[in-house]
């Protein structure tokens, strides 16, 4: 399925096709979608929006919102993201590595990557508390973050060196692009 340009591509028809088979029960379709940007002005290489969904058919147990992460509308940011393969890395993490870790990540419903365009449709976790960069985290928040980071790193320590798309610290394509 070809990726439309986002955010205007988030139509009920597109979302029904992309969420069918993984998120939507058979015979259920997205009938209406409304989009609210999240973190406006804070995203660097991608844009993020909350998509509020209405359904036609059996929607029992379905969340009525998903988070969409998609290629930046800013051409400079998009160019930098492509230079560092950020869209490929994001989609491949969700498809290939997320299933291998016990770290708490959102559930991924759909990923798509085409040239300089990408989209990830994932679980809406906006009800979770987000830390404050100015104030800092509480002890409990810090402990939780360290526990989750430990799970993430333990899952992949010395296990992804053969994956060309996972950046290393030295001698990587990222070092070459820093000139």
Residue ranges and their predicted role:
Residues 1-34:
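Juxta-kinase regulatory segment immediately upstream of eukaryotic protein kinase catalytic domains
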């Amino acid at each position: 399925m070809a990726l439309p340009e986002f955010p205007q591509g988030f139509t009920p028809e597109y979302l029904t096709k992309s969420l069918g088979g993984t998120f939507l029960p058979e015979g259920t379709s997205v009938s209406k979608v409304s989009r609210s940007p999240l973190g406006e002005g804070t995203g660097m290489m991608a844009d993020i929006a909350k998509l509020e969904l209405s359904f036609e058919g059996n929607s029992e147990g379905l969340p009525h919102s998903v988070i969409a992460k998609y290629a930046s509308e800013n051409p400079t940011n998009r160019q930098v993201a492509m230079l560092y393969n950020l869209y490929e890395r994001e989609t491949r993490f969700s498809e290939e590595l997320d299933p291998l870790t016990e770290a708490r990540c959102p559930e991924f419903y759909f990923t798509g990557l085409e040239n300089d365009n990408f989209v990830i449709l994932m679980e809406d976790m906006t009800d979770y508390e987000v830390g404050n960069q100015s104030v800092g985290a509480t002890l409990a928040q810090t402990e939780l973050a360290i526990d989750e980071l430990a799970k993430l790193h333990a899952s992949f320590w010395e296990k992804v060196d053969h994956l060309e798309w996972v950046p290393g610290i030295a001698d990587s394509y990222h070092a070459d692009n820093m000139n």
